[in-house]
Amino acid sequence: MGCLCINLKKKVKKPTPDISGEQNTEVKSREITPKEQPRQRQPAPRAKFQIVVQPHKLPLPLPQPQEKQKLINHQKQSTLQQPEPILGRPFEDIKEKYSLGRELGRGQFGITYICTEISSGKNFACKSILKRKLIRTKDREDVRREIQIMHYLSGQPNIVEIKGAYEDRQSVHLVMELCEGGELFDKITKRGHYSEKAAAEIIRSVVKVVQICHFMGVIHRDLKPENFLLSSKDEASSMLKATDFGVSVFIEEGKVYEDIVGSAYYVAPEVLKRNYGKAIDIWSAGVILYILLCGNPPFWAETDKGIFEEILRGEIDFESEPWPSISESAKDLVRNMLKYDPKKRFTAAQVLEHPWIREGGEASDKPIDSAVLSRMKQLRAMNKLKKLAFKFIAQNLKEEELKGLKTMFANMDTDKSGTITYDELKSGLEKLGSRLTETEVKQLLEDADVDGNGTIDYIEFISATMNRFRVEREDNLFKAFQHFDKDNSGFISRQELETAMKEYNMGDDIMIKEIISEVDADNDGSINYQEFCNMMKSCSQSHQSKLVQPN
């Protein structure tokens, strides 16, 4: 079977939502109801955490001037001290044991690097979590529990191995097995052909992880393709491994779980009803299987609120292409994994016993419609180039276009530092009449914080709110296009796109190819002005931020 040619112009019945993590943002321990969900969001670091230590009470009688000055100096030093260790042991300098290398990726709480063990020369992955971004006590508890669960599950074949955890004054560092093969989505979209059999192999590994977790008394609570990595670049020997146990919990007998966690497209209906158990992991795996077979999630909308409404409605499409050509056995498994009633939903053992998923089972080698691959490639990163374009336009809007937003920024930036912290954003939104929850405010800050430093600077604020000022105006779009078209050729070449994106650490070679594939409608290998405008105008409302939309 040869490589399939992906027809990017082929019309599909509904728009392809972005579930790559750019618009489908991970929801960490959200304390909100489905009706209160914010609009599309992008994962980004959390708010700046300011540590305040209460001053010591002065003893009676009052000290002499010299003693008083010593006490004041001691108080100043106390305010600079960090909170008590999260791991409950003395701080360690990780650089004494490991040398940190290039960045592998960024998440809500920190950055993952490649690191080398000094004593052995072996490479590992180091997930460095910035403690100032752990705003709530619950955030700190989640980190402790993540480490406990990873140690507890250590040695299981389809789970990323943790080597150790270290803590210094600024960060908690998790040193883990290095998975050099990349994310599950990359494996799917790179294949020369894609079949039901390939989908069965992938979902079998996913459900084996679920089975191990449930057998050992753990609910993952955030299963999605981005949280599965390939152990090596050699496809023949590579294993699929689960990672990111940041919202996972130990199963407690008789406990009803109520907090809404996970990622929008993969959330089970009982999570939204705040009454769930381990069956939610099977639902999430069922969503992954649905995507593997057709390229779209079973429940989609332009906003998280809309997605949740579709999930609660529970109607699954098996009529649109390519479902008529998918085997009945595959559809039967999907239906049983996505049973609305968790009591009727398959267990992990039942899934693995299904004839379609078993090794040597009914899953066919027949290639799935190439449009599925095309859609799945679109799920990866479409907004990367658009994000840079918005930033450029924000930097170049006229003064009169920015007056209102400039005043709003100044009013929120109460300490006149030139940046807005979490507390300033929360206070400013309350003054505007906003009724957003604490979690939603944090998410807004993360969405706008492009450089990941935990605060919003002026340009980031304008980028997040400026669509009210007609960002799609022709002159702004043309200037943005010229900014990327360095040689004035009338096209944005692959090299020009690569230069622009790598300047902001916003994309690797695969990502750049995918953006060109998606935007380049005439398939000439570059992006012309009309293609650029079409990209900027598509789903433009999804960029709108609640920063300027009080409820």
UniProtKB/Swiss-Prot annotation:
ATP binds at residues 104-112, 127. It comes from the Eukaryota. It is a lipid-anchor. Ca(2+) 3 binds at residues 485, 487, 489, 496. Ca(2+) 2 binds at residues 449, 451, 453, 455, 460. Residues 98-357 form the Protein kinase domain. Residues 400-435, 436-471, 472-507, 512-542 form the EF-hand domain. Its EC number is 2.7.11.1. May play a role in signal transduction pathways that involve calcium as a second messenger. This is Calcium-dependent protein kinase 19.
